[in-house]
Amino acid sequence: MVSGLGSRGNPFYGRDVLSILDFSRSDLEYLFAEADRVRRDPSAFSGELRGYVLATAFFEPSTRTRLSFQAAMLRLGGSCIDLGELEKSSIAKGENFADTVRMLDAYADVIVVRHRLEGAARFAAEVAEKPVINAGDGKRHHPTQAMLDLYSVKTLKGSVDGLVYGVLGDLKYGRAAASFILGLSLFKPRKVYLISPGLLKAREDVKEALRERGVGFEEVESPSEVIGELDVLYVTRIQRERFPDPSEYEKVRGSYVVDSKLLRNAKEGLIVLHPLPRVDEISFDVDGTPHAKYFEQARLGIPLRMALLKLVLKG
């Protein structure tokens, strides 16, 4: 539908969720307040979306995003349908993406799409009459992950503003990292360190978003250079599946690891976040430290997505 502004005093009602930059800071704060209400009394929301149907169409692998959307819908009293394995769907018979979206649009009240091609979710929104939520397309956009990550910072640190952030990992191909950085540009971080091997530096459009909004940032290659300054360390895996050349991946494979040795030099209150799945970029010896907040971050995905679905569908 490629929706305009929300209504009913709710900036999300009836809207597509395609990019974190489609929303303002005040929009996100409205969402976070609703997520707080869900966390305080989830049972009060148990029948909010009874009679509504969510469709998930994932053209790339997913665990947390797909299951958390489905769990959120079920906890709200709604129902879920899933496109399932692509080789068992009509896509295997040659059905095009637009026709698949049209069918889901006929069956459901909201469509959650993940696709390897950037722009696929926006195209789906142009085809569909119902709201479309982008669960990740290409290497740039993953808006609900960014919403969750910002909400996690707000919940765990009290505010998104005034903190020093380190975003570590694959900043070239990783859409979760890119969306988080774009999301930070809507707030007032004290500083953002973009930490990556030289081959995986953040793309220019992401850095330009920080410049346009007056967010100070610096590019460094090793977390050890800045670990003592950070309030939040956001770690991502190297996106092996997005490398056009396997030899390029081999050059950077295993080039950074967050372990307990690195964290000895961290602030006492540093939190370590990760959108998951992790591979080998966070050592298991970090899990037992007070810095490790990535599993708590993942758990916050349920109330955040419950709040989002409720606001998009019902207000």
From Swiss-Prot:
Residues at which L-aspartate binds: 93, 175, 237
GO molecular function: amino acid binding; aspartate carbamoyltransferase activity
InterPro entries: Asp/Orn_carbamoyltranf_P-bd (IPR006132), Asp/Orn_carbamoylTrfase (IPR006130), Asp/Orn_carbamoylTrfase_sf (IPR036901), Asp_carbamoyltransf (IPR002082), Asp_carbamoyltransf_Asp/Orn-bd (IPR006131)
Catalytic activity: carbamoyl phosphate + L-aspartate = N-carbamoyl-L-aspartate + phosphate + H(+)
Annotated pathway: Pyrimidine metabolism; UMP biosynthesis via de novo pathway; (S)-dihydroorotate from bicarbonate: step 2/3
A Pfam family it matches: OTCace
KW Transferase (keyword) present: yes
GO biological process: 'de novo' pyrimidine nucleobase biosynthetic process; 'de novo' UMP biosynthetic process; amino acid metabolic process
Record keywords: Pyrimidine biosynthesis, Transferase
Transit peptide listed as a keyword: no
EC annotation from Swiss-Prot or TrEMBL: 2.1.3.2
Annotated positions binding carbamoyl phosphate: 64-65, 114, 142, 145, 276-277
Family in the record: Belongs to the aspartate/ornithine carbamoyltransferase superfamily. ATCase family.
Function: Catalyzes the condensation of carbamoyl phosphate and aspartate to form carbamoyl aspartate and inorganic phosphate, the committed step in the de novo pyrimidine nucleotide biosynthesis pathway.
Oligomeric form and interacting partners: Heterooligomer of catalytic and regulatory chains.
Protein name as catalogued: Aspartate carbamoyltransferase catalytic subunit
